Amino acid sequence: LPQALRSEVARYWQAFGEAVGAGNREMPPDALLAQLVPVWGGSEFVARACIREPALLTGLTVSGDLATVNGPGDCAARLAQRLIDVGDEGRLMTALRQFRRREMVRIAWRDLAGLAGLVETLGDLSDLADVAVGAALDRLYAWQCQRYGAPRGADGQPQRMVVLGMGKLGGRELNFS
């Protein structure tokens, strides 16, 4: 890494150590530390997310999600698990933000550590967007139907809401722009 990035990563490391100590958490395993420099040097977002929530990095490590290629439905299954006890819009918004942050760190880490190629990274980002939008839509639609009744078309049939993913999402080409 260039010296400027090394200095930045050193500052991140110091802040991370303070956050870990303040929360009485354990430091990540040595194998993960070898990947930390290029990942944090390449992504301020990942570094700051880990500093803000040191348990995030530990959770990704313990779960094996940093080392594992996502299979079909893996992202959706993790989100479904996260949303089991969510019963209102405020908690849904919080859970979706936390899930997005966790998954974005996982995807970026795998990309920057050289554990995932371009196709995997683009696919994972697209899956994340797709399942998050779908989960939000399903819950919000159900809650609105409970409150106001299901919307009906001219023929009286219940109508669903639809979100169209076009462009990069529809083409499964979302990136970190």
Which residues fall in each region the model found?
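Non-catalytic regulatory/linker segments of enzymes
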Residues: 1-177
